[in-house]
Regions:
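Gly/Ala-rich beta-loop-alpha elbow adjacent to hydrolase catalytic centers
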Residues: 45-50, 54
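Active-site catalytic motif of lipid deacylating hydrolases and related acyltransferases
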Residues: 1-40
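The alpha/beta-hydrolase serine catalytic core
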Residues: 64-184
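Active-site signature of alpha/beta-hydrolase-fold catalytic machinery across serine-
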Residues: 56, 60
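Histidine- and/or cysteine-centered catalytic micro-motif in compact active-site loops
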Residues: 19-20, 47-48, 70-71
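Short, highly selective alpha-helical patches that border small-molecule cofactor pockets
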Residues: 2, 54, 131-134
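Structural motif
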Residues: 41-43, 64
């Protein structure tokens, strides 16, 4: 994604921070980065657990979201990974505590409110998460179902322009607040 945006001269539009282990700290970090950017348009993109966070942010703030093989019930899926875990990118490790699962539960979105705000990219060959849960959780969302594939969406370059086109869609912004009126 970063490489494609650089090719298009749009690198300044991209931010992909290293996320803290705490889900609540992750949400706070994302919100602070958006506030600091002071941009009128925001689309959050999240893969796996990042898709869960993106869904929370989309519902809380009305932002459009692109979800790449998103986790739907991560507190269930991650309960078997309590304790020290290796970091898959960059080396090192992190410690997953039981309270992290509680934080995830608190961020859950039972159902999305405006499916047109979402673009789901799900791979039927995801070896980590069940794509059918993803499809069921995002009814009505724009969806690309990759036949086969994997959790990392290793062939993402085939979909990056579709993702960018969705991000550039003008009518995904939250509706303007309506003026309250007195009904007689």
């Amino acid at each position: 994604m970063a490489a494609r945006l650089a090719e298009l001269g749009r690198s300044a539009e991209w931010c992909c921070p290293m996320l803290p282990v705490s889900p609540l700290e992750t949400i706070a970090l994302a919100e602070s980065l958006v506030a600091a950017a002071a941009t009128p348009r925001v689309t959050v993109i999240g893969s796996s657990l990042g898709g869960y966070f993106a869904t929370h942010l989309a519902e809380k703030h009305g932002w459009p979201a692109v979800l790449l093989n998103p986790a739907v019930v991560p507190q269930r899926d991650l309960s078997q990974y309590l304790g020290e875990q290796p970091l898959w990118h960059g080396g090192g490790s992190m410690v997953v505590e039981p309270y992290h699962l509680d934080e995830l539960r608190a961020l859950g979105v039972a159902s999305i409110t405006r499916p047109e705000r979402y673009y789901l990219v799900a791979a039927s060959g995801d070896e980590v998460l069940d794509y059918r849960e993803m499809l069921a959780h995002y009814p009505g969302a724009r969806t690309t179902l990759i036949e086969g594939g994997d959790h990392a969406i290793s062939d993402f370059e085939q979909y990056v322009d579709d993702v960018l086109a969705f991000c550039d869609t003008e009518d995904l912004e939250p509706p303007a607040p309506r003026a309250a009126g007195l009904i007689r």
